[in-house]
Amino acid sequence: RRDNRLRTSAMVETRGVRIVIDAGPDFRYQMLRTGVRHLDAILLTHEHKDHIGGLDDVRAFNFVDYPPTVHKVHIWAAPRALECVRKDFDYAFAQDKYRGVPEIELHEIDTAKPFRVGDVEIVPVSGHHSERFEVTGFRIGTLAYLTDFKTIEDAEAEKLRGTEVLAVNALRFAPHPSHFNLAEALALIRRVGPR
């Protein structure tokens, strides 16, 4: 049996704003496959390579007009994830950048406060990928997206009340040390009660 899956990611379009959640190593292929030509922001759930490994390919969204004008892609993440982006893609932040590097602008998320991309309010939802490793989910209107969650505190789960769509990870049937299994994901769904 072959594993043909791609790394998890989501694209949300609302109020004229296009947002991608996570840009793993398959980011370029995913964008080509869907024919996306414009991107306003990328929200990062955490700094693991399967969620940030494709950030170099945002360069395709930097120069889409003719004559070419630089369109920076805005990246939103918690402090720890931003630190890894700065380290892993240091050439994008160099004083003397070479031509063609990704043009990105980083924005730090305070998980206690909503933030905006254009006219779209985004509510960060904090959880844990493992005992000591934080991960951020996002609520955009009536949609919420949580990936690589293992635990979520009651106050954070409350941010999900009133959602119509809850996309949540469920790695497998058996328990796992750093991801919800199916029973845990279903328990969160029952707790939150999305439509």
Please tell me what each predicted stretch does:
Residues 1-34, 105-158:
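Core dinuclear metal-dependent hydrolase active-site scaffold
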Residues 18-77, 162-165:
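Active-site metal-binding motif and surrounding structural segment of the metallo-beta-lactamase
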